[in-house]
């Protein structure tokens, strides 16, 4: 066995754990339905949906430094190993944010203290970014509960779907962003659109924040759109630090699908987010790349060449030589709180691979908190596995983010923010 790597099958531990219900449904420990596997294998024969065809692989060891030293303390992780891992992801996966100077300003363009029939205050904030005569505006929409003592914890969602999911008038409501239910739980809820920061298409990085901050010829480790959207989330966090209604120590970043990938990278880069929630983030998010199950490194880079840095493309079909895998991305969130969830029909996003990544990130979380331990088997359908600062559930159904998921997020937040 190569130094610094370990087989995932070796991680079998004995411990007590908690299963708590997302809803009233009870099921056995989750496995993909054979009929779902058969259907997807037939309709997408170029991709693997069979556990029997997952290749043998080993994962990079989280706790071995580049010099071969074993990490055993919080100081060693924070001062040595964490910076190493973060740099590996910048260089090989997400890219580096340019150091181009810029200015930012905040302006509340609309405020309604009687929103939601008096339950909340609506604030619409323009976050303006300027650099050398070029500018863009991130439109932040937020609701703050009126009947709760301030400052309050807040959720920030990265919206990848469009205005029908974040209507500030609340004439249009969506489970994807159930603002009323979140306000009723005593949390502030906010959202910005990824397209405000950078367009979700391959425009050779000419528009959005790339068109403002990029200089010269792009390097292989130049930031992609996911890193740009994560950067935008941090600019929203900059605003929260100025708003006396928001508890800046208790802000969660939330994303679905490509937004989930973005939330994970935002949480890795910006430690001000005290809770990171990735909903069905799949390949390039929480799912282990080495499993080659569902969407692969090759496919995601060919379909979405603007999402990651160019260096990521060299691992297409060659995942085993990656210096990282996604358990290392999840470990970058420690010692803050992390919640991962998946959907039973979304095998494209590899639910088992997401759970394995979370499980294999635990050695880092446990350096900080021995209570952060989830079982070595996936929880049953529609049940939560929660211990310490980590949580997981797999919901029945398709690729989406629903009220059922949000209730689980809030239950987890209740625990870690109490």
What is each model feature region?
Residues 334-349, 395-396:
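Conserved strand-to-loop "acid loop" that flanks and positions the catalytic carboxylate
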Residues 358-418:
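C-terminal catalytic histidine-bearing segment of alpha/beta-hydrolase fold enzymes
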Residues 150-243, 285-291:
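Cap/lid segment of the alpha/beta-hydrolase catalytic domain
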Residues 9-18:
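Bacterial N-terminal signal peptides
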Residues 25-94:
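N-terminal pre-domain segments of enzymes
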Residues 162, 166-168, 234-295, 318:
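Primarily recognizes the serine-hydrolase "nucleophile elbow" in alpha/beta-hydrolase
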Residues 96-152:
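N-terminal cap/lid segment of alpha/beta-hydrolase-fold proteins
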Residues 278-329, 354-375:
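Mobile cap/lid helix-loop segments that gate and shape the active-site cleft of serine hydrolases
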């Amino acid at each position: 066995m190569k130094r610094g790597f370990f087989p995932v099958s070796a991680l079998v531990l004995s411990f007590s754990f908690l299963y708590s219900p997302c809803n009233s449904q009870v099921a056995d420990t989750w496995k993909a339905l054979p009929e779902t596997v058969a259907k997807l294998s037939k309709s997408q024969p170029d991709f693997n949906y069979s556990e029997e065809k997952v290749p043998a692989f080993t994962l990079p060891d989280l706790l071995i430094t580049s010099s071969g030293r074993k990490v055993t303390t919080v100081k060693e992780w924070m001062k040595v190993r964490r910076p190493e891992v973060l740099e590996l992801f910048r260089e090989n996966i997400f890219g580096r944010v340019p150091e181009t100077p810029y200015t930012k300003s905040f302006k509340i363009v609309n405020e309604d203290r009687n929103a939601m029939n008096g339950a909340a205050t609506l604030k619409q904030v323009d976050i303006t970014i300027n650099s050398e005569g070029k500018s863009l505006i991130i439109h932040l929409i937020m609701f703050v509960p009126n009947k709760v003592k301030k400052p309050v914890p807040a959720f920030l969602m990265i919206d990848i779907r469009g205005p029908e999911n974040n209507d500030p008038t609340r004439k249009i409501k969506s489970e994807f962003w159930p603002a009323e239910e979140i306000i009723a739980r005593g949390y502030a809820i906010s959202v910005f659109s990824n397209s405000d920061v950078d367009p979700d298409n391959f425009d050779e990085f000419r528009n959005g924040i790339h068109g403002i901050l990029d200089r010269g010829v792009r390097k292989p480790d130049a930031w992609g759109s996911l890193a740009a959207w994560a950067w935008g989330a941090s600019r929203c966090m900059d605003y929260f630090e100025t708003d006396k209604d928001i508890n800046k120590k208790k802000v969660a970043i939330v994303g679905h699908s490509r937004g989930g990938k973005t939330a994970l990278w935002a949480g890795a880069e910006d430690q001000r987010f005290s809770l990171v929630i990735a909903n069905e983030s799949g390949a390039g998010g929480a799912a282990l790349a080495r499993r080659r199950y569902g969407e692969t490194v090759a496919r995601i880079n060919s379909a979405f060449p603007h999402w990651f840095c160019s260096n990521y493309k060299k691992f297409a079909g060659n995942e085993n030589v990656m210096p990282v895998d996604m358990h290392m991305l999840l470990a970058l969130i420690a010692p803050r709180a992390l919640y991962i969830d998946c959907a039973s029909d979304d095998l494209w996003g590899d639910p088992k691979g997401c759970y394995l990544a979370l499980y294999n990130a635990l050695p880092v979380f446990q350096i900080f908190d021995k209570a952060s331990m989830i079982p070595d088997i996936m929880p049953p359908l529609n049940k939560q596995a929660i211990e310490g600062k980590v949580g997981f559930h797999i919901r029945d159904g398709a690729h989406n983010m629903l009220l059922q998921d949000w209730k689980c997020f809030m239950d987890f937040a209740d625990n870690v923010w109490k």
